[in-house]
Regions:
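Alpha-helix-loop-beta-strand connector modules within alpha/beta enzyme cores
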Residues: 1-17, 36-39, 43-66, 94-121, ...
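Glycine-rich loop at the start of a catalytic domain that most often binds anionic cofactors/ligands
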Residues: 1-5, 26-31
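Glycine-rich phosphate-binding active-site loops on the catalytic face of alpha/beta enzymes
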Residues: 36-44, 82-95, 131-164
Length: 168
């Protein structure tokens, strides 16, 4: 029921469930984001093929911390990559090694050299002042939670992020 309500109010948005493909498919989400310890992208696609109607759009994102993680995800048919963490964050418990700006530059360059055109979103400890340098690495976008949740005015902070991202 919650999935149906969300879909009624988010017809122009991607409704993504974190970590659980089965729940994402059952509640009518358009996407699932899989962490490194969740089921594989290929297993999620097998589930999706059984439950989606022909022509129905569904996205499967994968978490990555290295170029090799991206190679693996691309090989399994990932729709996009959540690459991180950018810096330390308390939002995630089992944190992979922090990449920093140089890590993003290196990995994005490796993706270009490999001919990958998969969307890459930076994640992990991102603040408003990080948007410009991160976007300049060639990533597609950012995923933010803590900076907005902990802001004095989360709505205004969201608008600030949107305005900054829209410059790219």
């Amino acid at each position: 029921e919650i999935g149906q309500l969300i879909n009624e109010h988010t017809n122009k948005c991607i409704y993504c469930i974190n970590d659980n493909a089965r729940i994402a498919l059952r509640c009518g989400a358009n996407a699932v984001h899989l962490g490194k310890e969740d089921i594989s992208v290929s297993a999620a696609w097998e589930m999706a093929k059984e439950q989606l109607f022909p022509g129905e759009t569904f996205y499967i994102g994968a978490t990555a911390n290295t170029f090799e993680d991206i190679e693996h995800a691309v090989g399994q048919g990932a729709s996009y990559i959540g690459l991180g963490p950018f810096r330390y964050t308390e939002t995630k418990k089992k944190l992979s090694p922090v990449l920093g700006l140089e890590g993003y530059r290196k990995i994005v360059q490796q993706c270009k050299e490999a001919g990958y055109k998969i969307p890459i979103f930076a994640i992990g400890g991102i603040c408003l002042e990080d948007v410009t340098p991160l976007m300049e690495t060639g990533i597609t976008g950012i995923a933010v939670s803590g900076a907005i949740i902990h802001a004095e005015d989360p709505v205004e902070e969201t608008h600030r992020f949107i305005n900054e991202i829209n410059k790219y």
